[in-house]
């Protein structure tokens, strides 16, 4: 049973412990192996097959119900308009949350689970990293220290991409981002061709912006979502995960001479950790408090993590 304490009766969410949430899996089959989960998870994210059983299978079942309801509504609208020429549009899932909280792992695991539904839907995954302005532009505008903040994204390009996806247009292109060079890759794109489901993941996907004074309509990125997920965790844990990940990257990816952060791989450990702490405090913590955490109440589903990246509580928006 969900925990309906008095203060939560007035919440738009129903709250479940991870153990109670796991029961909603029902007969949803586990279609991933331990090796596949290991391949899908991000650096420093220890999610395993047991966590897939506890949390992700119930999520998969819930999303299946939402997709089926969307398909039924589409059919009913065809009857309403007495038309069989309508273009079926993809079901879009948005995934938001802080840097280092585990968004990418969640997105990749969900993609694999959804792809393996009995209906075998075509599922694509795009991150907002590719929609960051190129480093040359950020440097010219003095925004390199604000990378990841709302103003560092080409929001117009995001909206055009999602508009095309929702319009059912073929071969929509999304820019590709390199975490090695820490920049958008010039001239390279992921081509998304009318998927059944699109997962759109990034720290900024639930953010709103100020309405224009001239009264013109301005869509938000989340206006295109059929379902949204926020990955949550206590601030001190995200801090710990960010610094730990930085230090592990220092021993791995940063050692590549082509890495934007290669210079950090040669620093003494104490100095490198100091830099990681400064990056967290001056950039990522500030962005979390100002722009990311305030969007949490806009999500349909909130996964609250505890130690070891394990989900401890799930909040599902009431219908």
Swiss-Prot record:
It is an enzyme of class 2 (transferase). It catalyses: (R)-pantothenate + ATP = (R)-4'-phosphopantothenate + ADP + H(+). It holds the Pfam family PRK. One of its GO terms (cellular component) is cytoplasm. It comes from the Bacteria. The keyword Transferase applies. One of its GO terms (biological process) is coenzyme A biosynthetic process. Its main location: cytoplasm. Its EC number is 2.7.1.33. Keywords: ATP-binding, Coenzyme A biosynthesis, Cytoplasm, Kinase, Nucleotide-binding, Transferase. It is found in: Cytoplasm. One of its GO terms (molecular function) is pantothenate kinase activity. ATP binds at residues 97-104. Pathway: Cofactor biosynthesis; coenzyme A biosynthesis; CoA from (R)-pantothenate: step 1/5. Belongs to the prokaryotic pantothenate kinase family. This is Pantothenate kinase. It comes from Chelativorans sp. (strain BNC1).
């Amino acid at each position: 049973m969900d925990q309906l304490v008095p203060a939560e009766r007035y919440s738009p969410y129903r709250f479940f412990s991870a153990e109670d949430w796991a029961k909603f899996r029902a007969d949803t089959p586990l279609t991933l192996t331990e090796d596949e989960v290991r391949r899908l998870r991000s650096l420093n994210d220890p999610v395993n097959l047991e966590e897939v059983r506890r949390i992700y299978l119930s999520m998969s079942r819930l999303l299946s119900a939402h997709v089926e309801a969307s398909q039924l509504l589409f059919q009913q609208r065809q009857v309403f308009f007495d038309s069989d020429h309508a273009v079926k549009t993809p079901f879009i899932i948005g995934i938001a949350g802080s840097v280092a909280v585990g968004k990418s792992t969640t997105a990749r695991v969900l993609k694999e689970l959804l792809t393996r539904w009995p209906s075998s839907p075509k599922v694509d995954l795009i991150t907002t990293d590719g929609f960051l302005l190129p480093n040359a532009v950020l440097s010219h505008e003095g925004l390199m220290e604000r990378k990841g903040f709302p103003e560092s994204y080409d929001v117009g390009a995001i909206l055009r991409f999602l508009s095309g996806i929702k319009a059912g247009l073929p071969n929509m292109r999304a820019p590709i981002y390199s975490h090695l060079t820490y920049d958008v890759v010039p001239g390279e794109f992921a081509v998304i061709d009318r998927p059944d489901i699109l997962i759109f993941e990034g720290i900024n996907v639930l953010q709103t912006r100020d309405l224009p004074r001239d009264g013109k309509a301005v869509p938000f990125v989340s206006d295109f979502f059929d379902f949204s997920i926020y990955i949550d965790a206590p601030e001190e844990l995200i801090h710990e995960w960010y610094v730990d990940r930085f230090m592990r990257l220092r021993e791995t990816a940063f050692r590549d001479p082509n890495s934007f952060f290669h210079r950090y791989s040669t620093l003494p450990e104490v100095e490198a950790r100091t830099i990681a702490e400064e990056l967290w405090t001056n950039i990522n913590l500030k962005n979390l408090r100002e722009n990311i955490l305030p969007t949490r109440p806009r999500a349909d589903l909130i996964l609250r993590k505890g130690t070891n990246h394990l989900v401890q509580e799930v909040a599902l928006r009431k219908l």
